[in-house]
Amino acid sequence: MIDSHELKRRDSYLNKLIGFQDTEPVKVITGIRRCGKSSLLKLMVQHLKDTGIQPEQIIEMNFESFDFRRMNADDIYRYVKERIVPGKRMYLFFDELQRIEAWEDAINAFRVDFDCDIYVTGSNAYLLSSEYSTYLSGRCVEIKMLPLSFREFLDFHGFEVRETQSALGGLRKQVFDKNSERYELREVFDAYMRFGGMPGIADVGLEQEKALSLLDGIYSTVVVRDILEREKRRGQKQITDPTLLRKIILFLADNIGSSVSIASIGNTLVNEGLLDDGKRKGAPSAHTVQAYVNALLESYFFYEIKRFDIKEKAYPRTLGKYYIVDIGLRNYLLGFRNRDSGHAIENVVYFELLRRGYDVAIGKIGNAEVDFIATTADEKKYIQVTESMMSEDVRKRELAPLQSIRDNYEKIVLSLEPGLDTSYDGIKSENLIDWLLSE
């Protein structure tokens, strides 16, 4: 087991947790398997100890452990009650709590019966379902955790970005590893696009065979434990076909950033002979496919993005898009090759915007489309993503939707053009890698 003092800090998440310390809401950390939730709990425990909280005030339960996985809500309550220190505030940490049936009863009882600060992780959105909210009367705060950003990837893998001076006096960013070996920034970014941001990759190194093994374990756990087994525990009968589930995963992974309808998924799988060795004639019902897609969204394997009509200021009932939580998982599923790199970098930008706290939608402006509208309570940005702006045709295509938007919010085109930092009639054009490193 890795001790907390050996864990890499992820300050953006840890600082959020610390900011909610000793407040009434239950702190709920959500995200796909193996994205770092358990490590974040350990870092929070270490923070408490470093700031004077005594070890006996801290109770940790990991429901992946054999010691706890067979417990029910009553068992959990008794376990905690026996360890309460009279007159002291207790800090309760529950990892992968969604495995326990009726866990909501125990959490609500702790809030009522004890002076405690509660932290929970879960790998399924069921943790924040309507049933859960009812039990806690809305008294919870969600920390949404994602795989590593590009900046975190550099840190976890021991890379450091430095500005170096060329013989002609110009400055450029280069990357150095722990052995002072030098790499071009684009080379390391390509490694990020290849292996993805699952923290465990840093433990096995940037070697394809080891990375594939780790990603296979994550994929299998999500499919088997977080979807198929959970459906059985809930007594649901909608998701019963592992083959159909895997085929839908492959379809969505292959179509990230493309407009997708639920009906088109089933029809494509049948038309291309991908179900029952091509023997199946009829497509699965839209209701069935929707249930499978919902399960993938609930497990944080895929994220759905809706369209927003900029002129009408409304969300029309039109097709959305899906993005995969980690580009390394996509490469594991579809093969390590240069496929559809335009949508792949879109995928990276989408999740970076989520990390930075934006609500993200696709922009519709007439018949044109803006890749992303990113909004917060007091900020809005329109963002286009493309591999290159060198071609005049591409420039016109990417700039036209932004030029047709009649407001004064920031408009940006991100591309992989090196050293790019220019403007087209007030529309900023930035290098994507520099943008990823900018915050």
Where are these regions (language model features)?
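Pre-Walker A adenine-sensing motif
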Residues: 4-22
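Conserved lysine of the Walker
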Residues: 37
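Hydrophobic positions on the alpha1 helix immediately C-terminal to the Walker A/P-loop
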Residues: 40, 44
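Structural recognition of the conserved hydrophobic beta-strand(s) that form the central parallel beta-sheet
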Residues: 117-123, 144
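Interdomain motor-coupling "hinge/lid" segment immediately C-terminal to the ATP-binding subdomain
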Residues: 131-254, 258
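Accessory nucleic acid-recognition modules appended to NTPase machines
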Residues: 208-379
